[in-house]
């Protein structure tokens, strides 16, 4: 990760202003500017495990990954540089959390792409750190203000829930399909066979809805769930608990923290990383699945029909089949055979 995002390029136009600052970087940290900008001291807090992986290699313990930042994460910082995400409720959660910890008088910078809705930062922070726009370039806005009043932050107030066929789904800001079950997941669920047994891995688990729905009609499966997102990991744990389903849930960059092999891997893989379309995770999922499937095990994923997954599936497994499709989505199935092991 060396190329800077447009938001970071805008910040670099002001790099002289940051040389004496003790900076906390937070929000949608899609590059390694926090590790490379010349400052008096730098810390970073992220809810994205893959962003933490990159930053921690260069920043060590000064890069932190968690759902909620703590006093230790912001210690000694006099400046916040916040990268605005595409999701406004996610920004609200993170900013209220961070501003409740930082001392009054902290310099606050918010930067983001115009299409991500960064302008709404002004209204969001009006009562705490009134912002002014100080730069506009690369289709991004940079805003500056000073923290005048700490907000009260209560993470519990950000939880939401909805029901799907009698199942309770717990959600948090930034979790995929936060307001209801997406069409792709519905299609994938329709293909799952009742009374399935064995070890099942749900990659990119989101709020955990695929796993709890699968477990309801296949109670003998043993579930493992993972996601890069701290909100997703916590939401999945809560969804499992709310439905009395057991399973292991942890943060992982696709298979980075996954141990062992499974009889089935299911996923509705992401193809957006922040505002950037990215197929990397799905391709890593397909190619890496052969190292985590038992012989005869299967990978079953749902994806937008236009995405180029058939070629990667055939390269990796030797073949694939489409077991369900609509105009927009396809469910792909590939089986772990000797042919696949050579791939």
UniProtKB/Swiss-Prot annotation:
GO cellular component terms attached to this protein's record: cytoplasm
InterPro entries, sorted: DNA_methylase_N6_adenine_CS (IPR002052), Mtase_sm_N (IPR013675), rRNA_ssu_MeTfrase_C (IPR023543), RsmC/RlmG (IPR046977), SAM-dependent_MTases_sf (IPR029063), Small_mtfrase_dom (IPR007848)
Enzyme nomenclature, EC number: 2.1.1.172
Catalytic activity: guanosine(1207) in 16S rRNA + S-adenosyl-L-methionine = N(2)-methylguanosine(1207) in 16S rRNA + S-adenosyl-L-homocysteine + H(+)
Record carries keyword Cytoplasm: yes
Keyword flag rRNA processing: yes
Subunit description: Monomer.
Protein name: Ribosomal RNA small subunit methyltransferase C
